[in-house]
Design a protein with these regions (language model features):
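Conserved pre-ATP/AMP-binding loop-to-beta segment of ANL
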Residues: 15, 131-148, 155, 178-184
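Conserved beta-loop-beta connector loops within the AMP-binding
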Residues: 289, 308, 320-338, 372-375, ...
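Structural core segment of the AMP-binding/adenylate-forming
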Residues: 42-47, 70, 74-137, 435-437
Length: 488
């Protein structure tokens, strides 16, 4: 299977559960899923969607959301899911860049955002047609999904993932985790992230198993969902593990239940958190590493006794550690992580310069620093960029700084990540006012509230007469990071 269309053809021949709604228990077997997706493909075609178009989605986790993602790809278009926490400004930027043929969203959700300058034709998430033409199937190298990632330049970039990218990574992960028709994944992460789309949906479908789609993660309901739906695994981020640790003990019968293991990634897991979780619940947590540009996962720990906690596991595809001249470094040496393989993206949508910078000599430059130990396990050391990872959400300081600098009273702005016991990192902004202007935390937070998603907003603001600079006038963030790292 090399395309989403072929995956659905395969599942359309079986009567085993494929997708399950966590709240209602509604279950779609393979034949029903294939039929529902075909009905959504017809609705997209009737709305004018053609091969090569984009289909934007602003839909919460649901069977409808998962079906529409599959339908857009099956129609030969690229699905473009939108972060539900974005503001109208952020959504407008995506719509202007992606130029989707349709936006699949409920009217009330779009109205809640406010005016959108680039809103295309709206299509209801309930749109399904029982009859009508179906388009030719897509090719493996057609773009199936465009995921917008926070950009280091201050604007989100669309990573183009092909059918081959998605299916090869899904199959590789399923094989590595030894998933089969009896396995079931509980999907509580949002379906606008690669983790939920790939690990939470495509991996179980490609293995012949099923996915339970929950509207969102709620720590207080997690173990009850495990008891009700009997999943064998679930994807998490470290913040979710911390929230589960903060809940009262579940009944003994629910403490592990059907779970073989949990999967985690998106941010490093503190060793103390990992050990505390496994001791309390008796569920192994399998760490991995990846990024949107490599579809989902590039490494995973083994699921047996060879796993190495505090590492990100071993490569699933070719991975190197290189120096600044692209020379391979020996085991134990720290350098940039670069990747190659069928999981590496096609490129950034309409951004050839950004694509060329990220893809050099056939290798994806991740911007992350790491080392491979003598046994081939990857250890993340830091980030070459200044990326902040807040509860699994990527936040780039440049975007926040540009928003802050647009405030009429702000002369200088610098954003760094500050340690946080729940989210891993949060945003801390350092500001210098314009001459004669007054700045206070409340007015700056109000400014950010209408311009940035909640996870991007600073949780602490420090106003200084001037920000630290070097001899050439370059802003120095090291002293600010030191301040952020020592806060109580």
């Amino acid at each position: 299977m090399e395309t989403v269309h072929e995956l659905l053809e395969s599942r359309g021949r079986d009567g085993a559960p494929a997708l399950i709604d966590a709240a209602s228990g509604e279950t779609l077997v393979g034949t029903a899923l294939a039929a529902r997706v075909a009905g959504r493909v017809r609705a997209l075609v009737a709305a004018g969607v053609r091969s090569g178009d984009r289909v934007a989605l602003l839909v919460p986790n649901s069977l409808a959301c998962a079906e529409t993602l599959l339908a857009a790809a099956t129609a030969g278009a690229a699905a473009v899911p939108i972060n539900l926490r974005w503001t109208a400004t952020e959504v407008d930027h995506l719509l202007a860049d992606a130029e989707p043929r349709v936006l699949v969203a409920a009217d009330e959700r779009v109205r809640a955002l406010g005016p959108l300058a680039h809103c295309p034709l709206l299509l209801s998430p309930d749109a399904v047609l029982a009859s009508g033409p179906l388009p030719p199937p897509p090719a493996p190298d057609d773009t199936a999904l465009i995921l917008y990632t926070s950009g280091t330049t201050g604007h989100a970039k669309g990573a183009m993932l092909t059918h081959r990218n998605l299916l090869s990574n899904a199959r590789r992960i399923a094989d590595w985790l030894r998933l089969g028709p009896r396995d079931r994944v509980l999907t509580t992460m949002p379906l606008f992230h690669a983790n939920a789309i790939v690990i939470g949906t495509l991996v179980p479908l490609s293995a012949g198993g099923s996915a339970v789609i929950a509207e969102r993660f709620r720590a207080a309901e997690f173990w009850a969902s495990v008891d009700r739906h009997r999943p064998t695994t679930a994807g998490t981020v470290p913040t979710m593990l911390a929230l589960l640790l903060g809940e009262p003990d579940p009944p003994a019968a629910l403490a592990r239940g059907s779970l073989r293991f949990l999967l985690t990634g998106s941010a490093p897991v503190p060793a103390d958190l990992l050990n505390a979780f496994e001791r309390r619940f008796g569920v192994p947590v399998i760490e991995g590493y990846g990024l949107t540009e490599c579809t989902c996962r590039a490494t995973f720990n083994p699921i047996d006794g060879r796993r190495r906690p505090a590492s990100c596991g071993v490569p699933l595809e070719p991975l190197r550690i290189v120096d600044g001249e692209d020379r391979d470094l020996p085991a134990g040496a720290v350098g940039e992580i670069v990747l190659r393989g069928a999981h590496v993206m096609r490129g950034y949508f309409r951004a050839p310069e950004a694509t060329a910078a990220a893809m050099r000599g056939g290798w994806l430059r991740t911007g992350d620093l790491g080392r491979l130990d003598a046994d081939g396990f990857l250890h993340i050391v830091g980030r070459a960029s200044e990326l902040i990872i807040r509860g699994g959400e990527n936040v780039y300081p440049r975007e926040i700084e540009e928003t802050l600098l647009a405030h009429p009273a702000v002369a200088e702005a610098a954003v760094v990540g500050a340690p946080d016991p729940l989210y891993g990192e949060v945003v801390w902004a350092f500001l210098a006012p314009r001459p004669g202007a007054r700045l206070d935390e409340g007015q700056v937070l109000a400014w950010c509230a209408t311009r940035l998603a909640d996870f991007k907003r600073p949780v602490r603001i420090t106003v200084m007469p001037g920000l630290p600079k070097g001899p050439t006038g370059k802003l120095l963030k090291a002293p600010l990071r030191a301040l952020a790292g020592t806060r109580p």
